[in-house]
Amino acid sequence: MTVYIWIVAISVAMTIGTFFHHALLRNWYDVFLALPIWLGWFLAATALYFLLLYLISLTVDKSKPVRKKEPFFRWLLNQTVWLILHLGRVEIQCTGLEKLEGLSSFLLVANHRSNFDPFIAIATCPQADLAYIAKPEIFDIPITGRIVHKCFFLPINRTDNREAMGTIKYAAKLLQKGVVSFGIYPEGTRSKTGELLPFRNGAFQIAKRAGAPIVIVKTSGTELIAHRFARKRTTVRFDVLDVLEGSAVSKLPTREIGDYARSLML
């Protein structure tokens, strides 16, 4: 939460400075000016942060593969995720995090209800260095596409099975080496009704090839964030349901893994 705290601190300092510089505290009721002045400085500081983030993102060449971890870009990703969740007034309630103790890298499998789902997972598991396999359009979004590229997020072409399998093999290699953990949404798309969609079990090949644990998670409430953003507090849940050990994952067919994970999420 470092960036968020700095933005709040800077905006408070600038508000105090504004009062003293312009001698605004001449009457007792002038204190009511503090909130709008602070809000103005807060928005200005936030805008400045995103401007700096944009300028930093311009240094990233998405055509070049990432060869090693980039701690600075991971820090930027984590800080920006926390900032956005704070701006959106999102509160995360978690259960089962103790099941992740001792896990260095894993495949996180969850239901998909909102574009904010990855934000919640990254904010909840910052130590995991989560990366996602995502649709190619994500990498065309200004700032976002370049930052996540540096954090080993991978685009997958679902219209080309051979290319998609190449992405899965590369993700398995990164997972096996412990470079990052990966998150996937086996439904393949967001559920607009809240009902769990059929699973595409091929993505479980990432964990099978890597011999890595699978962390099964259920999220709820994320579909409300966009509608309430900043206007109303949103409480979301992040529940770790079970962890399948890597040795078991290697032996199980992907269909059985998918059926088991889906049964827990229902």
List each model region and its residues.
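Short acidic-hydrophobic, aromatic-tinged amphipathic segments that line or gate anion-handling sites
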Residues: 94, 154-157, 246
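Generic preference for hydrophobic
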Residues: 94, 108, 132, 238-240
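Catalytic core of membrane glycerolipid acyltransferases/transacylases, capturing the structured
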Residues: 57-77, 86-87, 101-161
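Membrane-anchoring hydrophobic helices of lipid-metabolizing enzymes
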Residues: 2-105
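Short, well-ordered coil/turn elements that cap or connect secondary structure elements
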Residues: 87-89, 127, 148-150, 177, ...
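Non-catalytic C-terminal accessory region of glycerolipid acyltransferases
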Residues: 7, 165-266
